Structure formats: structure tokens, C-alpha cells
Curated annotation (Swiss-Prot):
The gene coding this protein: MAPRE2
Disease the record associates with this protein: Skin creases, congenital symmetric circumferential, 2: An autosomal dominant disease characterized by multiple, symmetric, circumferential rings of folded skin, affecting primarily the limbs. Affected individuals also exhibit intellectual disability, cleft palate, and dysmorphic features.
Ranges of compositional bias, category Basic and acidic residues: 300-317
Keyword flag Ubl conjugation: yes
Taxonomic placement: Eukaryota, Metazoa, Chordata, Craniata, Vertebrata
Tissue expr: Expressed in different tumor cell lines. Up-regulated in activated B- and T-lymphocytes.
Protein name per Swiss-Prot or TrEMBL: Microtubule-associated protein RP/EB family member 2
Description of how the protein assembles with itself and partners: Interacts with DCTN1. Interacts with APC (via C-terminal). Interacts with monomeric and polymerized tubulin. Interacts with SLAIN1. Interacts (via the N-terminal region) with BAG1. Interacts with ASB14. Interacts with HAX1; this interaction is essential for epidermal cell migration.
Residue list for modification Phosphoserine: S9, S219, S236
Chain positions with Phosphotyrosine modification: Y167
Amino acid sequence: MPGPTQTLSPNGENNNDIIQDNNGTIIPFRKHTVRGERSYSWGMAVNVYSTSITQETMSRHDIIAWVNDIVSLNYTKVEQLCSGAAYCQFMDMLFPGCISLKKVKFQAKLEHEYIHNFKLLQASFKRMNVDKVIPVEKLVKGRFQDNLDFIQWFKKFYDANYDGKEYDPVEARQGQDAIPPPDPGEQIFNLPKKSHHANSPTAGAAKSSPAAKPGSTPSRPSSAKRASSSGSASKSDKDLETQVIQLNEQVHSLKLALEGVEKERDFYFGKLREIELLCQEHGQENDDLVQRLMDILYASEEHEGHTEEPEAEEQAHEQQPPQQEEY
């Protein structure tokens, strides 16, 4: 058996070449030999450069379900990948030992904690010679488009490098609770439910009524007052139930509307992404049409406002009547 500073070559022989990282330790990763046996050795990851949208590209719902299934997480939105914890565990799964999961903040809730995780991910990319620039500043902001682009690329990178071995993500992170990052939008439709009894007038009356003294005879209300109070209470209960039903219907309709808007947004974003990739492929031809399309895709609101001002001034100048010459 090789020593702690030795590795196994693909043919099973000892490799005495010591390769050290910045900390002076050997970090091997797993790969297959020709015989199908498991061995540990240094090597390069399979890089993926294609980012074009194809039929194999997964939707945002499917890709989140894939992430949760592979690394046993409970994410609900693409934006929650901004913590970087899932990517760190993916790298440990693909290349065991290239990253220390003990240093990963699986319960990260703040931006500086997200940056910490992405620094670990960058270091693992460097060790495995992954030619991919991680847009950390964009990802940690939790924007949908930036995180969707990166996870789509990472899915292809995963498919190109996964060797099919079994992996227990919970055991690998030593039972750390992987709490998804907070999502402000999630609180809109998940308001805490209050018990109907706590909101009823009868409950408030029961809490506010003083305790009867021992030996004193409490005065009993008349039958007419009891009937009127019970009637008003039942009426208010029915009104509250009606309001609850109406609010639930509104929440359901808003959820459906939101899902429709998100699907439409994803559809048009995919179209724009395809146009952008075509423009990038033909950008070296110095085509005026391609350049105009690129200007439209990357134009900001401020830039668009500035471009409209000269046109408005030119139209106003054309509408002015010509001045008569003086003799």
C-alpha cells in the first residue's frame, strides 16, 4: 500500500511524485482505471464551454429538483443557489478531497458568508484546472438570471465529469443541516396561520373576563342578552369564514398568475439568450446588423433614454418653420 504522500497511478502502481497544494497537503481525487477499478490520482477535470440552450436544457423547476435530489437539499428557487454551498458539495462529489466541506457554511444567510463559500469553490476549480470564471459578485446578489445561467452550465459540467459512483451527501457534510438561504418573496404566500378561535370575539371576551371570587355569586345575564350575544358571535364567525375563503381564493389566483408570469419570463429570456449566443458567434464578422442587435441587448435604461433625446431634438428641429430672410 502507498504511503500518505503517495498516490496510485491508473495501472495501480505506486507514484512517488509528491504534489503539494498551498497548504502543503496531498488532495487526490477519484477516477476510473481501464479495468474499472477505483483509484486516486491527480488529473484535470473535463471542461465544458458550450452554454447554448438546447432541448436538453432543464427548466428552473426541474433543475432545482435535480439539485435537491443529488445533494439532499430543500431549495425551492434557483435564487437560493446564491449561497454557493450546493456547488461546493457537488465538487466534493465529483472530485473527492478537492474541497473541505468542514469549511463550507451550509447555513449561510448573509452575503459575506456566500462569498466565503464561492472562494472555496474557486479554489477547488483552480485545483482541478476548471476553465470557468465564477461571477461571484452577480451570483451572491441572488438574481434569477445570473444563478440560472451558472447552474445550467454546472449541470453540463456535472454530466461530463460524474463517474457514477454512489455518494452520501449528508454523511459527507457530517450531518450539517443545509438550510436554504432566506427568500423574501417566499414570505408573501406563507403567512402564519392564526387559529380561528383566537380571532373570535368569544375568545377575547373569555380572556378579558375577570376570575370570579370564591363565595361571590356571579350575576347571570338575561336570556335576551344571551341570545343577542350568541347571535352576533355566530354572525361574526360566518363573516370571518367568508373572508378567509375569499382571501384563500385571492392567494390561489395570485400564485397561478405568478407562475404564468415566471414561465413567460423564462420563455422570452431563453429567446434572448439564443439571440445573444448567435450574435457572439458572428460578432467577428463586423456585421452592422449583429452590432445593432448587441447594442439593443446590452443597452441599459439610462443609455436608452440618452439615445432618445437627440432623436426628439432632431424631430423638433424639423417641425420648426423656416425663418424668412430679411432684405
